[in-house]
Structure formats: structure tokens, C-alpha cells
Swiss-Prot record:
Statement: the UniProt record of this protein carries the keyword Phosphoprotein: no
A GO MF label: transferase activity
Keyword rRNA-binding in annotation: yes
Gene3D superfamilies assigned: 2.30.30.30, Nucleic acid-binding proteins, Ribosomal protein L2, domain 3
Family of this protein: Belongs to the universal ribosomal protein uL2 family.
Subunit structure: Part of the 50S ribosomal subunit. Forms a bridge to the 30S subunit in the 70S ribosome.
Protein known as: Large ribosomal subunit protein uL2
Pfam families with a match to the protein in the record: Ribosomal_L2, Ribosomal_L2_C
Role noted for this protein: One of the primary rRNA binding proteins. Required for association of the 30S and 50S subunits to form the 70S ribosome, for tRNA binding and peptide bond formation. It has been suggested to have peptidyltransferase activity; this is somewhat controversial. Makes several contacts with the 16S rRNA in the 70S ribosome.
InterPro entries, per the entry: NA-bd_OB-fold, Rib_uL2_dom2, Ribosomal_uL2, Ribosomal_uL2_bac/org-type, Ribosomal_uL2_C, Ribosomal_uL2_CS, Ribosomal_uL2_dom3, Ribosomal_uL2_RNA-bd_dom
Keywords: Ribonucleoprotein, Ribosomal protein, RNA-binding, rRNA-binding
Annotated coiled-coil segments of the chain: none
Transmembrane annotation, as ranges: none
Length: 275
């Protein structure tokens, strides 16, 4: 789908670039596959802010997505492609031959009326799901499991994909979008193709208000605060902060490594390339 630009009738319209969603379903979502979603405003169960810059925004309903793709050997027909406010990718409503319906993440080049299937061995075409051990080396995949049966976790965002670059001793070798090379069990499921809506990266919201509609509140820089509020705060006039960048709680940020899962370190063959 293409991008939409607008006549500069206001400053916000001048900068606005959106994805053209005119080809998507214009009705309501499948009611049996949705549930209520309450906005947390970045608060946890104690009511304290655990994620800053969240709050407000339009009310949403959660679409229940099938990330596991474990309904094997039953063909499904794509009924429609839909917008999902909870993610950047588009979703597809599929209807199985036995009457069951499900939402899946829509890959690129998937169209209404197409047939998709999850199986031990299936055709290499967008939307089909199978274990990594049965997918040819070099194939582009998305919605990849990290643990067998847990459901896809890798490459679910708009335009993303993972490339299968090798197989060795029961493991599949994957090249991620970050450049990281890692191993995943060959029994893990993956879906063929790249995720839909690759133009998402070119969207420009045009004004701060549109971000607020999405539940994103303003982000205040530490150097603009007072010393009581942030380690970078204070100083007469504009200052550079005077120390290496830290969070409001004094922990190093911007480049500080935060990964601490030694059990899976051996599965990472090459780390992602950082600046």
C-alpha cells in the first residue's frame, strides 16, 4: 500500500504522511476474536508509573492473534485484511475449512481469497507456517518461535523479516533484522514471507497531538528539568548535562548493555552491530 500526503492547509497537515489503508476492511472486527482492553497509562498494579510517556489515547479493543499456528493440515481462506490499532502490522482474518476463524499477522503479498495452511511440510508461499527444519535455507520468514510451542516472538512488526541462513545439529540459524545471527530449535514454527505494511517506517505524524491520540505523552529531556527531578537537571542557562547520559534514577543509558540471560548466550552466534 502507498503513502498519503496532504495539502498544507495547516502546519500539522503539511508534515503529515500516513499509510493509505483504503484497501483494508472498513467494518468492525470479528467480535468472537476480540476482547476488552483497559488502558494502563504506564502504571503497574501498585499504581506507580513504570513506563513513562504513556497515557490517554483512543479506546481500543484487543484482537486475539494466533501466533502459534498450531492448527495443522487444515486449509484456511483469507476472508479480509484488517487494521489493528495494537500493532503496526496489518492482520488477516482467516476461515478454516472446519468453520473456525482466527486472526494471523498478514504477510506481504497476501490477498483476500488466498489459501494458507500450517503443516509439517507446506508450499513456500506467504502465510504458510511450518517448522524451521522443513523450510529451505535462504527463505524469508516472520513470526518465528524462540521456544517450541510458545508462539511466534521474532519479526512480528510491520515490514520485518528473518532470513534462514543455515541448519546444523537440530538448530536453525537465523539472521535477524538487527544483524544478529542466532540459533533456534528446528522444531520451532515460522511463517513464510515478510510482515505487511513496510511503509510504516515512512510515516510522519505531523503534529504532537496525533501521537497523543495514540497514547504517547510528551517526553521531557533531563537537561530541561530541575536538579531534584533528574541528574542532568539544573545549571544556569543551557548546559550539556556534565556527565555521561543517565536515567532519572542514575543508571547509565545510551549504549549501556542490559542483556543478562547467560543461559541463551550460547545460542547467539554473532551479536548485533552497535554504533
Amino acid at each position: 500500500m502507498a503513502l498519503k500526503t496532504f495539502k498544507p492547509t495547516t502546519p500539522g497537515r503539511r508534515q503529515l504522511v500516513l499509510v493509505d489503508r483504503s484497501e483494508l476492511w472498513k467494518g468492525k472486527p470479528e467480535k468472537s476474536l476480540t476482547e476488552g482492553l483497559r488502558s494502563k497509562g504506564g502504571r503497574n498494579n501498585t499504581g506507580r508509573v513504570t513506563v513513562r510517556w504513556r497515557g490517554g489515547g483512543h479506546k481500543r479493543r484487543y484482537r486475539i492473534i494466533d501466533f502459534k499456528r498450531n492448527k495443522f493440515d487444515v486449509a484456511a481462506t483469507v476472508e479480509r485484511l484488517e487494521y489493528d490499532p495494537n500493532r503496526t502490522a496489518f492482520i488477516a482474518l482467516v476461515s478454516y475449512a472446519d468453520g473456525e476463524k482466527a486472526y494471523i499477522i498478514a504477510p506481504q503479498r497476501l490477498a483476500v481469497g488466498d489459501q494458507v495452511i500450517a503443516s509439517e511440510k507446506a508450499d513456500i508461499k506467504p502465510g504458510n507456517a511450518m517448522p524451521l527444519k522443513n523450510i529451505p535455507v535462504g527463505t524469508i520468514v516472520h513470526n518465528v518461535e524462540l521456544k517450541v510451542g510458545k508462539g511466534g516472538q521474532l519479526a512480528r512488526s510491520a515490514g520485518t523479516y528473518v532470513q534462514l541462513v543455515g541448519k546444523d545439529q537440530g538448530y536453525a540459524q537465523l539472521r535477524l533484522a538487527s544483524g544478529e545471527l542466532r540459533m533456534v530449535r528446528g522444531e520451532c514454527m515460522a511463517t513464510i514471507g515478510a510482515v505487511s505494511n513496510p511503509d510504516q517506517q515512512n510515516v510522519s505524524l505531523g503534529k504532537a497531538g496525533r501521537a497523543v491520540w495514540m497514547g504517547r505523552r510528551p517526553s521531557v529531556r533531563g537537561v530541561a528539568m530541575n536538579p531534584i527531578d533528574h541528574p542532568h537537571g539544573g545549571g544556569e542557562g543551557r548546559t550539556s548535562g556534565g556527565r555521561h547520559p543517565v536515567t532519572p534514577w542514575g543508571k547509565p543509558t545510551k549504549g549501556k548493555k542490559t542483556r543478562s540471560n547467560k543461559k541463551t548466550d550460547r545460542l547467539i552466534m554473532r551479536r548485533r552491530q552497535t554504533q
